[in-house]
Amino acid sequence: MKRLAKAAFSQNSLTAPIVSTFVYLISVVRVVLNGNWPVTSSDTAMFQHIGWMVFSGKRYYIDAWDPKPPLTLELATIIAYISNGDPHLQHTLSVVSTIVAGILLTYLISHITSEITGNQFAGLLSGIVFITFPVIHYSAVFGYEPKYFVFLFGLGSIYLSRNPKPILSGAAAAASAGMWQFAIIFPIISFGIISRRKSKDLILKYVFGATIIAFISLLPIYLQGGLVAMTVEVIIAPLYAGETQSFLYRLVKGVTHLKLMIPIALLGMAGILLGFLDDIRERWWVVGLLLWFCIQIFILDYDGADDLFLGIILVSMGIGFAFEKLSTKYESERINSIVTAVVVCMLIWQVVTLGGVGVITNPYSYSGDGPDQAILESGIQQFAHLSGYTEYTIGGSPPDEQYNVKSRYGPDKIEELFFTSTIPSTCHYRLSGMELEWMNLTEQSFTEEKCGKWRLP
């Protein structure tokens, strides 16, 4: 067992990303062997389709309603241009780019934990635990998933602030927030780390880096005349048409998504709190991220298991912190051997059986049996169930008009639109719960060709 601990889990900082590479490849092979390739979720297909639409001459936010900040859609467009508009090549490149981001994120988690604890094995453990969560290693197979890039840039901004490299840190923080509204915590924390050095020069460089990325991301939107549409869909609509689920509903959903990983999650959170008490000055930002994650999940945004991403990162780091506490209290070699055995078993179980948890983040079962109709419930049905509206109270559209739109569009039709290179006749074709609620509040029609007009409920 000691040899296993020293060889398979050596002190090499590249061990975790190397292991994660093999895990991602296993997930890809699983999908290919099941005959499901190419496969997407409604979200990944939507991002990729918008990227292809812009490549084909359409405009962000105007020709396709979407609440994601611009960098998410612009990166999808870059991939569409690289693939020259071929949807199958675009999808493959999207999977590859997402996996690469996941591998780099694994390295970053491992490296930062090692740096904080001064224990490389603790860092290695954090990286391995991160990749054992099925939602992490399996979601990347479904195409372009922005969350991997969001947290790669976000965690990168914190790492660069700690070193410090203020221009790069500011740029990375802005890129993170430019892909997901709730990543705004990363500019706040990374700026806080920079500010503690009490250097005006560092602060100005940080602001400069952030400004450059903000300018680059907003310029295409401005040139397309989409700033108003972006403001409405990215900022105003989520404020008025956000989620309304109860605390208990969200808690049960979290338990459902985590299942067998609940003990690991609890241990990781305990590790974060213990580490914080040991070194408040060094680890305050970890607790800050944990508090923000709780606000996000229980109040602001928890649509699916991919919204647990930040929590999984923090739990993984917390496991490293917990190991550090154990290794200082007990004999290090014995602890290394025991932890290695547990982690290897957990890794094999989570990768081979996907934790035995079934569907997590996408409309396909892990067994490869095809679409799960319970997951493929249309956005209109979801909205009606959650809010109490009937099918025909959405916007100002008559029933026959709504029926015609629903028969061609919706969450379960996005994949077909993407792979057949189809341009929808309406800008409202995703028909997510938020989109439908916004349409109802502002009395928009299902057949509108252009979205993003300045409207308030």
Curated annotation (Swiss-Prot):
Topological relation to the membrane, as annotated: Multi-pass membrane protein
Signal peptide location: none
This protein's pathway: Cell surface structure biogenesis; S-layer biogenesis; Protein modification; protein glycosylation
GO cellular component, one term: plasma membrane
Main location: membrane
Enzyme class, UniProt record, top EC level: transferase
Transmembrane segments: 13-33, 92-112, 121-141, 174-194, 212-232, 260-280, 284-304, 308-328, 338-358
InterPro entries: AglS
GO terms under biological process: S-layer organization
Coiled coil (UniProt feature): none
Residues in compartment: Cytoplasmic: 1-12, 113-120, 195-211, 281-283, 329-337
Disruption phenotype: Mutants lack the final mannose subunit of the N-linked pentasaccharide.
Keywords: Cell membrane, Glycosyltransferase, Membrane, Transferase, Transmembrane, Transmembrane helix
Cell compartments where the protein resides: Cell membrane
Top-level taxon of the source organism: Archaea
GO molecular function, one term: dolichyl-phosphate-mannose-protein mannosyltransferase activity
Enzyme Commission (EC) number: 2.4.1.-
Residue ranges, Extracellular side: 34-91, 142-173, 233-259, 305-307, 359-457
Function: Involved in the assembly of a N-linked pentasaccharide that decorates the S-layer glycoprotein and flagellins. Transfers mannose, the terminal pentasaccharide residue, from its dedicated dolichol phosphate carrier to the protein-bound glycan comprising the first four subunits of the N-linked pentasaccharide.
Protein name: Dolichol phosphate-mannose mannosyltransferase
Species annotation: Haloferax volcanii (strain ATCC 29605 / DSM 3757 / JCM 8879 / NBRC 14742 / NCIMB 2012 / VKM B-1768 / DS2) (Halobacterium volcanii)
Gene: aglS
